[in-house]
Structures are given as structure tokens and as C-alpha cells.
Amino acid sequence: MKIINLGILAHVDAGKTTLTESLLYTSGAIAEPGSVDKGTTRTDTMNLERQRGITIQTAVTSFQWEDVKVNIIDTPGHMDFLAEVYRSLSVLDGAVLLVSAKDGIQAQTRILFHALQTMKIPTIFFINKIDQEGIDLPMVYREMKAKLSSEIIVKQKVGQHPHINVTDNDDMEQWDTVIMGNDELLEKYMSGKPFKMSELEQEENRRFQNGTLFPVYHGSAKNNLGIRQLIEVIASKFYSSTPEGQSELCGQVFKIEYSEKRRRFVYVRIYSGTLHLRDVIRISEKEKIKITEMCVPTNGELYSSDTACSGDIVILPNDVLQLNSILGNEILLPQRKFIENPLPMLQTTIAVKKSEQREILLGALTEISDGDPLLKYYVDTTTHEIILSFLGNVQMEVICAILEEKYHVEAEIKEPTVIYMERPLRKAEYTIHIEVPPNPFWASVGLSIEPLPIGSGVQYESRVSLGYLNQSFQNAVMEGVLYGCEQGLYGWKVTDCKICFEYGLYYSPVSTPADFRLLSPIVLEQALKKAGTELLEPYLHFEIYAPQEYLSRAYHDAPRYCADIVSTQIKNDEVILKGEIPARCIQEYRNDLTYFTNGQGVCLTELKGYQPAIGKFICQPRRPNSRIDKVRHMFHKLA
């Protein structure tokens, strides 16, 4: 059986949830379609999902059409950052991108299409709501060509009389895009030679599979118009990315969820082979797991199963597997564009309105962060505050919605701040000697520190011989140094430097590894004071698409937001601006873009890295440590 993993993507109110229900209903998977208004749909059941068009809880549902099984996978992704959208698409074999016939191309549509193109995922356009009044389809086509891609092929005609209907487009003009993109076909056309329809269809299919040609279909999901034709196209056009004839197992975890009873489930895409109940599967060089229970999506529901075939989705109860964990032979994993998860760039504190809900909040954050690599949290051991690190404002909206609707927790969140970093300005050394006040530890430690190019991270080297200082003491020094790097002179993480352990001395038998572990961060701090540090802040690459009249406004606003516009291009009555901007300014820049373009502007962002901060230095309160703070202050007085 052919299995296709399909994503349905759309901007808010384009009809994604209604289309999913219509596909299930028309295929016979369900007896009647669910209602968005009544909250009976199988996907997007949370309030924020409906309001913002954001998928929060992954829902995998499926239907069967003849000998083809189609898994519909909702693709969660924080629209703040492209990297997260890319990650959520990596499991798909193909996508249907909805365009509302009434609303046309929206900003979110363009962001999603940009991601689909980057990932080279075969994509069909489905123009929904064609039965509404005042629809101008030729204008929608022009807008698609101008704002999405000129490489579209309209596969259907929409009739108006005696009632709205959808039929196949048999005009030869539809093939112009296919002919113009192929030299051999173009040469035939120019010389007046006849075409074989099979030649055109073969070239159309080749470019569709490569993600460079986009067929356009039409319908009304609400009234099940054009849905049967869409199902037939999905079943015939999309291929599974699973290699044929490969019996060895390969699967990858793409989602982690917790049930209401707090059971942990992992979603696995099987790329090759077959997974059986009671199989023992390798997940690393040293670790294996036994499959004791498994479910697969079948006709709109999840059912227990003894097997999961190549290409299918399987849900396993498991406490060991992590996001992106590989089951079986990782060599068989398809080679797709690798998207590295960006670092969280914002942080804030979160608290409960009712003190008795604190433990529930901590448990909820543990579960949410387990399935979201862009969310991290810790509890300050002294203030007991819960500190969240995250990527963007949409992500925080999602977290709050999940806390309220799934865990019934009311949370208060402070205004977030950007996460800065510190980098030494110059090379420096510092040594604290044993039995020299105010050193209370039975250890001597000497460290040197020097700056490295931005983006290098922290490099550590010991220049003290193991014959002179044994491994346990050396390990303790490294642990202390890494702990000291967590907070520099301004309270931010230290990065982009090389730290060398230059000198160490111990007294036998009184010295212990703890002496070296506690002294090392104090020595590091003194070395940093001699070196001085500069503050680094996260910068983003941005790409703005906006009406031409926005150009002067963009240049006018750029200095206010510390933005640097590096290139400008005019295309199809639109201006394309590329540049760099501090992460702390992007939200206001986006808000202004939306306001001045009446929602037509699109801003795509990707993390560039850290650069020297502009403006005044922002300090972060140092986390207390009762074991070393007194000694730190004593050395601070000596300085």
C-alpha cells in the first residue's frame, strides 16, 4: 500500500480545519464532518489555534482512498522563526497550501510557501471558498504569480452556471509554464512540432516532485465542492519519500506529547522497514528499546496495531526516546535540508496566580519543553523564581494557551528581555594561591583567558600535567570554570573565548576536588575583571516583502530600530528589503510593518548570530551561591 504523509497549511480563516474534515468525510473515513463552531473537529480544537491559525497540539489523522493511505499531519511551528517552521515540515511527503478565494495571499501564506520551497516539498495550491460572492479568480492567479511563484499551472476551470462547478482544464494554454521551463519542449514549440501529451505530463510531474512547479485546484471545503477531485490528485500525484525494497528499519521521532493521564507518547515516522510489536530496536550504539505497545492512525482514529509499515506514522508510549531520536539504521534516513535549532533569545519569569498550582506549573513546563526544543526553563535556587528561555512572542502565546486549556493553570509572565552574552576584550591571567588570604580553599588555581572570534564558543584547555595534578582535581577545575562561564561581569553567559588552566597546587591529604571546583569560578571572575568584557546581543537576518510605497518608510524607520538595510529590489510592484536587526527590535519593526502596509507586508527572519551590543549595557542579577559568594566579595574588595 502506498502511504503519503501530507501537510495542510493555510493562513487564519482560509479553511484548513474545514478542509481536513471534508477530506475525511468525502473519503468515507468519518460519518459526518466535524464543526469548527461546535468544537467537534479532529484538529485545531484549542481557542488560540482557531483565533491565530496556529497548530498547537499535533493531530495525526488519516483516510484511505482505494489503495492509498493518506496521513494528514498538522504541522506546528512558531511563525516567529523560519527554523521552527522548517523543522515541523521535515516529516512531510507533500503539502496542500490553501489560498482563500476571498482573502487572497496573506502574509502567513507567503511565510509558509517560503518554507515549503526551502524544504523542496512538493506542493499543491487549493483555492478554497470559490462559492462566495464577489470572487475574482483571475486576480487571485495574478496575485499568486506575483507574491508566491510564477510557476503555477491551473488544472481546473470553475463554472458558474447553472451552479458553481469544477471541471478539468483542457486548454493547451495551461501548459505554457511547463513548456517554457524545458529547453527541449520549448525548441519543439518554436519549430512548430507537435507535442505528445505524455511528454508534457511527464515534465509537469518531474518539476512538481522537485518542488519547482505548483498545480492549482479549486473548491469549497465547507460544501464539499471539488474535494473528491482533490483527493484523487493527492492519491496520484504525491510520492512517498520511503525507499523501495529496503527491509531494514529506520524511523525518526518528530513529536512528543503527553496524555491527560500524563503518559508520554512519541510520534515516529517510519522511513524504511517494518516495525513489529515486541521488536527490540537499537536507538543508539549502547541502547535498545522493546516495543510493547503501538498505535497507528486509521480512518480518522488511532488504533492499536501489531505492525507499522514503511512510510507510516506510529505512536509509541515511551519515556526514553527524544525529539529527532532515530530508531534503527540512521544511514537510511532521507537526506533533507538540515535545519539547526536556533538558540532561545528571550527570557522571562513565570509564576502562578494561585500558589497551590506551582507544582502543576513545573510539571507542565517539563512536559511542554520535552516536545519543544526552543523552550528551556530552570528554577533559581535562591529566589525560587521560574525562568523561561524561549524564541519569540508567538511561542509564548502558545505556551500560555496550553497552560490554560490543557493544564488549567493561570500564569503571570513578566515582560521578556533579550538574552545577552559576554566576550572578553583582551587576554588576561589570574592566580589565587593556597593559604594566601582570603582564599579559604585547599587549592591553588591559575587561569588565562583570551578572546576568540564571535561564534567560536568556549574552548577549554589544561596545561597542567596529569602527573602533577591528578584527573579528579583537573575535572573539578574544568567543572568550576564552566560554572563560572554561566555568569560573567554583567551576569550573562561568557562565550567566544579560550580558557587555559595554567597552574594548580594541592596539599595532600587535605585538598579535595571540591576545593578546586569552588575556587575556579572565583579565579575566572578575577581574570575576566582584568580582561574586561563586551556585551553581545543576538542579531537577525530579515527579508521584507512590502508594497513599493513602503520603501521610504522602511529607510526612515531603520535607524530607530538599529536596522541595517543591505539590499533593495523592486519586483512586481513590490519592494524586497534585506538586512540585519537586533533581536530586541524585531517585534516593534514587525508591528510597524504590519500597520503601515495594512497587513500586506511580510517579514521573514533567521538568526544571524551574536554581535557587539549597541547602547547602554544591561546587567542581569547574579544568581547567589552560598558556598562561594562570601569569598567572591572578599576578592572584590581587594580589587
UniProtKB/Swiss-Prot annotation:
Gene3D superfamilies attached here? Answer: 3.30.230.10, 3.30.70.240, Elongation Factor G (Translational Gtpase), domain 3, P-loop containing nucleotide triphosphate hydrolases, Translation factors
Q: Name one Pfam family in it.
A: EFG_C
One Gene Ontology MF term: GTP binding
Instruction: Supply the alphabetized keyword list.
Output: Antibiotic resistance, GTP-binding, Nucleotide-binding, Protein biosynthesis
In the record, biological process GO terms are:
response to antibiotic; ribosome disassembly; translation
Q: Give the matching SUPFAM superfamilies.
A: EF-G C-terminal domain-like, P-loop containing nucleoside triphosphate hydrolases, Ribosomal protein S5 domain 2-like, Translation proteins
Q: Is Glycoprotein set as a keyword in this record? A: no
Family, similarity comment: Belongs to the TRAFAC class translation factor GTPase superfamily. Classic translation factor GTPase family. TetM/TetO subfamily.
User: Under which name does UniProt file this protein?
Assistant: Tetracycline resistance protein TetO
Organism of derivation = Streptococcus mutans
